[in-house]
Amino acid sequence: MIEIKSKLISLNILWKEGINLGKEAKTNAMRMLDKKKIPYEALTYEVDEFIDGMHCAEITGAPVDASYKTLVMQGKSKQYYVFVIPIACEVDLKKAARSVGEKSVEMIHVKDITKITGYVRGGCSPLGMKKLFPTV
């Protein structure tokens, strides 16, 4: 169970490949926040193959120092892990592996993101994934 303490959470909702998700479209993370009556602001942006966290912050007007990216990795044990890091930072795979007690971790392949998390690249939230994964 994830404890949510924030009064205002910004979420990224995608306009993927020209499909307008519409005003009523909700992600699992949004449904969780709605259920707990936690206010949030949904930000939308176009997703392309070159999108990164810095670009998302720039086009949505979100402050870089308060923006994070969600990275999903798999350990040598085949266990999945979710890492939430500032968008301006790069992940150190050796430190990431040590933090979860693995010999090594690697990023999951882009084609597997939706199957594993339920989200698309560029819009992966640590909240509301298909399964509950250890989150660092």
Regions found by a protein language model. Name each.
Residues 8-136:
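Extended, low-hydrophobicity, polar/charged segments
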